[in-house]
Amino acid sequence: MGKDYYQTLGLARGASDEEIKRAYRRQALRYHPDKNKEPGAEEKFKEIAEAYDVLSDPRKREIFDRYGEEGLKGSGPSGGSSGGTNGTSFSYTFHGDPHAMFAEFFGGRNPFDNFFGQRNGEEGMDIDDPFSGFPMGMGGFTNMNFGRSRPAQEPTRKKQDPPVTHDLRVSLEEIYSGCTKKMKISHKRLNPDGKSIRNEDKILTIEVKRGWKEGTKITFPKEGDQTSNNIPADIVFVLKDKPHNIFKRDGSDVIYPARISLREALCGCTVNVPTLDGRTIPVVFKDVIRPGMRRKVPGEGLPLPKTPEKRGDLIIEFEVIFPERIPQTSRTVLEQVLPI
């Protein structure tokens, strides 16, 4: 079952925009890592930011209300578009920095750092909401000085948000041939006035080269959320292999697990080995095959990343299936012919 963003913010469905803002304000202050040191607070803080990102956007909220998280992220009902992925791999993923969202909401990069130092021990302070005495939104802190005084003309130095990483799942066949992946993201962009923000969709195109290794990173600079206080994060996709129903990958080699009987292991056999491009190679074995033994078929693996015209090997890994019972007559024959 997918996430319930209303439950994350402690809201009922049908909550007003003002109720959503108040709920985000309350929960974000409660679980901010600078205040809440409990295990899991950082992850909860991120979940709260994602919930607010969806519910504060009318279009995302409408899709979520109709299809849930699965529909919002492109894996909803197969009969509909659930947001219109247009053939892309997903329609929505939270790419924002929860700390930047918090700063934008309250009008300061991280008010916790100095605020608690100034009000530490003050009576009547609301522990869950230390900013309860101030207005909500960008205007609440614009005329307040947190920490050491600073000349008015000194500009605030912007910092880039940390990279936002996502897995990019590809099949062995796609690594073998190379492929193109189109990933749809939704991020926030700063309007020309330098203050207001719009939501913007963008298609990121990834050319997966033949033979790329698992763990290869593809970076799209500054494609994360943009605010007046930050430099957008880089969006980074990390290549991950999809599980294959036949092969296992070992670098540029592929491993084919061959199951043979004890008789075949002792007397020899022919193994019909499939390849990634759909062919079948018959490989003859005349010697005794031991459990776990490996044999290479050279040049039938994946392309090498730096020299894709060359290929790794296809490795046959044997599993010998022993019989559960042997008739007495067969046992007698085996005792006579097998070496001690």
From Swiss-Prot:
Intrachain disulfide bonds: none
- Gly residues: compositionally biased ranges: 73-86
Q: Cellular location of this protein? A: Cytoplasm; Nucleus; Nucleus, Nucleolus
Keyword match Ion transport: no
Top-level lineage group = Eukaryota
User: InterPro entries attached here?
Assistant: DnaJ_C (IPR002939), DnaJ_domain (IPR001623), DnaJ_domain_CS (IPR018253), DnaJ_subfamily_B (IPR051339), HSP40/DnaJ_pept-bd (IPR008971), J_dom_sf (IPR036869)
Q: Name one GO biological process term.
A: chaperone cofactor-dependent protein refolding
Q: Which GO terms describe its cellular component?
A: cytosol; nucleolus; nucleoplasm
Classification via SUPFAM superfamilies? Chaperone J-domain, HSP40/DnaJ peptide-binding domain
- Quaternary structure (record): Interacts with DNAJC3. Interacts with HSF1 (via transactivation domain); this interaction results in the inhibition of heat shock- and HSF1-induced transcriptional activity during the attenuation and recovery phase period of the heat shock response. Interacts with BAG3.
What is the protein name for this chain? DnaJ homolog subfamily B member 1
Q: What's the name of its gene?
A: DNAJB1
